[in-house]
A protein has these predicted regions:
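N-terminal helical cap/lid subdomain that shapes the substrate entry/recognition surface
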Residues: 1-4, 8
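C-terminal cap/substrate-recognition subdomain and adjoining C-terminal extension
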Residues: 13-14, 19-154
Length: 154
């Protein structure tokens, strides 16, 4: 897109607001557990929204600009990065619960110890009827914070 700098794009993104209730949801969730956002976006696009969300940890891709601020190239951290991040966290002994809303989240959700959908398109709900699906933050928060698994140490 000629004539548009990264700063121009960030200014536009900075005018967007997170979904109503998103900040409160993340704040309540972070009181009870660690949260990592895995995204296919770019750090530079995510920054304005992450600021509004209280700077949650986000793993995503990266853009590179030239001296004039125009996007020159990008770096995708790795293919299927969401799934690979879950594999890595599980290999470190973490129980991982993944939540997504689109087809590109399914390998991550299926690789996690547990997973759910949040406000997905109807087509995904119909194709994956065994995945819990939520439309409201309170239901998702309950799913994420009520541990139904028995403690293996007991």
């Amino acid at each position: 897109t000629e004539g548009i700098t990264l700063a121009d794009i960030q200014e536009t993104i900075g005018g967007l607001a997170p979904l109503p209730g998103a900040r409160g949801f993340l704040d309540r969730l972070r009181e009870q557990t660690q949260v990592i956002i895995l995204s296919d976006t770019f750090e530079q696009f995510a920054t304005p929204l992450m600021r509004q969300l209280g700077w949650p940890t986000i793993f995503c891709n990266e853009l590179f600009t030239d001296a004039a601020g125009y996007i020159g190239s990008y770096r995708l951290r790795q293919s299927d990065g969401k799934r690979k991040a879950v594999v890595g966290l599980r290999s470190l002994g973490f129980d991982v619960t993944a939540v997504g809303d689109s087809y590109n989240d399914l390998t991550m959700i299926e690789t996690a110890d547990s997973g759910a959908l949040f406000r997905p398109p109807r087509s995904i709900v119909e194709e994956y009827p065994t995945l819990p699906s939520f439309t409201e933050y309170d239901g998702l928060l309950h799913f994420l914070t009520v541990d139904t698994r028995a403690d293996p140490a007991l």
